[in-house]
Amino acid sequence: MQEIKKILVPTDFSENAQLAYRHAQEIAHRAGATVDFIHIIPTLTYFHKSLSNMQAPLNLDDEIYPMAQKEAVHRMQTAMDDYIADETKGEAVCKIDRKSSTAIAEHARANNHDLIVMASKGHHKSALLRGSTTNKVVRQSSVPVFTVDEGLSSEGLKDIMVPTDGSPLSFTALPMALTLATLYEADITFYHVQELYGSPLDSDNRDPQKSDEQNIYEALMGRLDEFLAAEGIDNVKIARGDEKFRDQFVVSDNASSRRVNIYTAIERVVSAHLGIEDYAAQHADVVVMATHGHSGFAHLLLGSTTEKVAQSLSTPVLTVKPDENKLSAK
């Protein structure tokens, strides 16, 4: 499981941005974490040059930016007073940068944040279900990013969907999914796609007495076991259920243990991203997915398929990026 002790909330002070405040507070309350806010003031290169050419009395670096930063910090502190409990309240940071998404991702990495919680869209509402800044943060951040909207209640979620092609990289999302599941007492669904040309799990040992779905299910459980062992996640075991496609994780914590229901959904669809969209819309409160898959599950989330999934999902998404060493070794 992945520990959550520091949460970063980027804000542009829009009504949409406020959606992230309640979610961050709820997660912090359940996990015993602190919540930091960040606002990025974009550099105004053209305006800076214009003032210099005009010999204007105002100076951006010495006057305009410091005033704007002071006002932004005040607004963040006011928002934190309204939405964040004293025991989970962290710091309010305002930075000046040419690229807000890069600044957010770098700040989260440099300050050891465990999770970024942000609204799907900010001031610049787009026809896409996730705005350009949010998508750029998802793409650039090495820290998991949880994008929320008004459709998800901050008080709880019950169904977590984890798309997987059975590869270790796609299972990278599991520790964060397990953390959410234990915090909210939610269930986890592993969603696997059989595209037209088949499944990457078709090559595993097959039992001719079982259906394609049952063989894929058994192969998926086997690979999941291998992933837990390879990653040294010794406190999580799979308890196989009596009913097909329904099992449990047993999560041990010192002398106690908790159980998380897991369900495996296997569907034959035309494309992975369409299958994910449709299933998530009907069955999931949040989709937790790795930012890279393998084989036929497509360039999940580091290519065109990723962008289609991230932009078009109407369900909140939490993205997790694998370690760079694992990506390069793929």
Predicted regions and their residues:
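Structural beta-alpha unit
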Residues: M1-E3, N16, P42-T45, K70, ...
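Short, structured interface segments
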Residues: S132-L152
